[in-house]
Design a protein with these regions (language model features):
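Long, contiguous internal "core" modules enriched in hydrophobic/ aromatic residues
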Residues: 1-93, 103-106, 179-182
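Extracellular/periplasmic helix-loop-helix junctions in multi-pass membrane proteins
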Residues: 3-6, 71, 110-114, 135-149
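Alpha-helical transmembrane segments
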Residues: 27, 102-104, 161-167
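Hydrophobic, well-ordered secondary-structure elements that form the walls
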Residues: 57, 101, 132, 173
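Hydrophobic alpha-helical transmembrane segments
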Residues: 87-98, 153-160
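Juxtamembrane helix-break-helix junctions at the cytosolic face
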Residues: 101-113
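Central hydrophobic cores of alpha-helical transmembrane segments
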Residues: 115-126
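Extramembrane terminal tails and long inter-domain/linker segments of multi-pass membrane proteins
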Residues: 154-185
């Protein structure tokens, strides 16, 4: 989101990381809310692992040529993100989104356990949320901060997700008619 930043691979990386977030969200919902059986969780864990590897590959193949070429219009995007106050966020992101899920999702036990898969995917989702802030915020702020607007947007998203789940399950009392059942059936 820098005016002079240019990268041909950024769109592909953003698309693949969005798919990674979708797969992690699907596995998270299946583990915590849908109470899926172990075989389905194992398949979702394998897909999450595959998208983790693909996203890590895309980020590495995005950063390596920029670092090697050292072109000012490309390097200017990464300079504030790897120096100063943003360095620790970069390290946390590398662990939460790229390097952490890889060894933890390699075990069969982690992919078949609701608690482990749900915990791993929740860390991935939080890491990807922080990564979106990491992509945008250094252009506007010199030091990292998560304020009320960022937290309220995240709370609104999770609230809408929970509300849609409650509506889909027919458990929200305001949408229930005693004689006809759930409205819309």
């Amino acid at each position: 989101l820098d005016l002079h930043f240019y990268s041909t691979l950024f769109g592909g990386y953003f698309f693949v990381s969005g798919l990674y977030a979708g797969m992690a969200g699907w596995a998270f919902l299946s583990a915590w809310f849908l109470r899926a059986e172990a075989d389905r969780l194992h398949d979702l864990g394998r897909l999450t692992l595959a998208f983790s590897i693909l996203t890590t590959y895309m980020m590495f193949s995005h950063i390596l040529p920029i670092w090697y070429e050292n072109l000012p219009e490309e390097v200017i995007f990464f300079i504030p993100r790897i120096h100063g106050d943003w360095l620790w966020i970069t390290i946390v992101l590398a662990v939460m989104v790229y390097l952490g899920p890889l060894p933890s999702l390699l075990t069969i036990r982690a992919k078949r356990s609701r608690v482990l898969l749900g915990s791993i995917t929740s860390l991935i989702l939080v890491g990807l949320w922080i990564e979106r802030l990491w992509l945008v915020q250094p252009h506007f702020e010199e030091s990292p901060r998560i304020g009320l607007p960022e937290l309220s947007m995240a709370a609104a998203f999770w609230g809408a997700l929970y509300l849609s789940r409650m509506l889909a399950a027919g458990r929200l009392g305001a949408w229930r008619n005693e004689e006809e059942g759930v409205i819309g059936e």
